[in-house]
A protein has these predicted regions:
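S-adenosylmethionine
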Residues: 1-230
Length: 230
């Protein structure tokens, strides 16, 4: 079934209109998509892509344009950058990829700006010691590195991972590599006590628990109460 672009734009607009300090874009996206019963799987994916393209390329957009036009412009910029990243001058990327206040606090390098504008990889966290078997089961995946990093897999296949048996069986979680590194750096041991002071929706806490073999005490807290309620 063809993707209905007008429908995608309408839903993406609802997400952006709903997003605020108390409802970050990822939460607003989940809430709106939960309410949308008539979208195809492809339209769900395209809506997510449109929302995050809008925020990723916000520094290039004209705020006086109607929101649907801004979203379309962001999608066009995203496609150009994917195909020809060198067509964006380094000084332009450094200037527009982050808000002005960021440049007052830290140096914005071309490498960082390029990374911010690139589509993120999809990272999975396998159960401890199960990275190799999960990679064989999924196919189209590769480990982040040797040793402990072998349980962190970058997935580049077409499957909806939330629907496959391995996910439903709890064999892996979807978790960004930087978040996985937190647990590996902590390297908790079974029987220890740890406090996750920025628990969010629990991904890092679950990783700590897995590394502790579910033996010990784990406290979790977060400034955003709604994240803990999830």
């Amino acid at each position: 079934m063809a993707i209905r672009h007008d429908q995608v734009l309408a839903v993406a607009r609802r997400v952006i209109d709903r997003a605020d300090r108390e409802h970050p874009a990822d939460l607003a996206l989940r809430l709106v998509l939960r309410e949308e019963r008539g979208l195809t799987r492809g339209e769900y994916a395209r809506t997510s892509e449109a929302v995050f393209a809008y925020y990723r390329w916000h520094g290039w957009l004209k705020e006086t344009d109607p929101l649907p036009d801004q979203i379309n412009s962001a999608l066009e910029l995203m496609e150009v950058f994917q195909n020809e990243p060198g067509s964006f001058p380094e000084d332009e990327l450094c200037d527009r990829a982050v808000p002005a206040w960021v440049k007052e606090e830290i140096e914005v390098t071309p490498g960082w700006a390029n990374a911010l504008q690139s589509l993120p990889s999809l990272w999975l966290r396998a159960k401890k010691g199960q990275g190799a078997s999960l990679m064989q089961s999924l196919g189209l995946a590769e480990p982040a590195g040797p040793g402990d990093l072998s349980d962190a897999l970058r997935y580049f296949g077409p499957e909806d991972l939330f629907r496959i048996p391995d996910f439903r069986a709890g064999t892996f979680e979807l978790q960004d590599l930087s978040s996985q590194m937190v647990g590996l750096i902590c390297a908790p041991k079974p029987g220890e006590t740890w406090w996750d002071a920025c628990a969010g929706e629990g991904g890092k806490a679950l990783h700590l628990s897995d590394l502790m073999e579910n033996k010990g005490l784990l406290w979790v807290s977060d400034r955003a109460e709604w994240r803990l309620r999830k």
